[in-house]
């Protein structure tokens, strides 16, 4: 069946990609042809989505208890070969799909374009803003430059290729959490995941990390 958890819009085993196939965009404000905005959860296309999900549920393709299963519980079924398809985000390949492959080396997961409904020839997936948070400094702050200094220090410790201290601060291994999580500030390049995917593609084929460093080396080793 299709993996699904009770967080229907949470990126992991959710229904957003399924809804996009019907031209529905739950929790998005969608611009209409006349320039007005409509809330995506209230459109006729969303009603079609729910009807299709109800049909899957009634025919046994969805776990009867998905509404009480969080992501971790739903992932257990996937890892134990009880699911054959899921909608998810980029990190899904790292977890839980990798756990399933570790347990069942014959598992064969592949990415596909979002399947379209009969009424839709192509799908535009709903995506979030690349910038998800901002920092602001009060005009009454005695040392406003401290924010920039903190950000510079964060970049130096996590990203500097000469220091190459990413593993120490971000991914020490052995089940330990990286101390970067303790930082009061953080930032990332908006396209870092795309750049990492391109950078490690060839090394994964050859088995030679070459000059990879930092997060890209960590992803290669993972």
Predicted regions and their residues:
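Short, solvent-exposed loop/beta-turn-alpha elements that line the ligand-binding surface or hinge
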Residues: 26-44, 117-124, 177-198, 202
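Glycine-centered hinge/linker elements that transmit conformational signals in sensory
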Residues: 35-64, 113-120, 201, 209-211
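Short helix-initiation/N-cap motifs at beta->coil->alpha
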Residues: 67-76
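Ligand-binding "clamshell"
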Residues: 96-122
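A bilobed periplasmic-binding-protein/Venus flytrap-type ligand-binding module shared by bacterial periplasmic
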Residues: 128-143, 162
